[in-house]
Amino acid sequence: MPTLAAILHTLDPFIVQFTPSFGLRWYGLLYASGLLCAWMIMRAVARRGRAGLTQRQVDDFITEVVIGVVVGARLGHALIYDRVLFTTFTPSFPFWELLAVHKGGLSSHGGMAGLLVVCWRFARRSGASFRTLLDLCCISAPPGLCLGRMANWINGELWGRPLPQDLQANAPWWCVKYPREVFEPSFDPSRLEPLRPLVHAGDDLQQAVVAAAYAGDAKVQAALEPLLTAFWPSNFFQAFTDGPVLAVVVWIVWLRRPAPGVATASFLVAYGLLRFITEQFREPDAGVNTLLGLTSPMLISVSMVVCGVVMAGRCRAAYRTVRDGSTGGS
């Protein structure tokens, strides 16, 4: 019985390309779309009087959120996954690799840390409730998190783990294969020799095969696909859990009008648990530290769950104290 082919990643990260390394990318467009969604949600909540901010204040707040998220996400990526970015300089713009955000490399954990700083600063300056601002951000974040994972997919980054060996020979239709695997040290380039007649290859057969595959050459794609490893579609898993699933959890909590900060606590617990689960299917980045078999993202996710549980308890206790005090004084 014939089976559907695996998902072969041949997406172009550029929408419009001006030079080999510069152009309008899907990565940036999707991140901008996520922030636009957050702004629209915040304004809608403000119109209903539950944001703790006016609509004009929301406009000021989202501007700072954009800066905080991008800076935090980039620094988080460099600290957790790729510290060499701090010391790498190039002759081309933007000269310092840490600033080369257009190439990808934004950490969701880092973005959340940046968001925390923004909420704290804005609350102190405006007099708004810090916990209410956090809640506002948490109910607005899932669309951006989902789109961020799809941006990772289009960029061909953050691969999943290889499927078990017994599934490699007859890989299921939902698995993902990456032509760029031929550049990995573990891939034997001699396996590509049967494809040489299909491409215009000089000395660099690997580059020619990958270029043809991404250019849409069906014959090259068909010949290359069986040679590639089948990976878990971790980008899709995390897009689903970080987006629709997380949104449902946080919005159910928020719509019940809990104490300020409880929606944030539910976000921390839900995101931490979901991220920990989906990280089991994601290939750890090279150089990422591990402790007791857990990668840095897993450890951070566990910390988020613990912080969420503690925060929920403290928020409810503080809310009861205020409520009882108000009742007693009436």
Question: What residue spans do the PLM features occupy?
Answer:
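A feature for loop-to-transmembrane-helix boundaries and adjacent hydrophobic helices
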Residues: 1-330
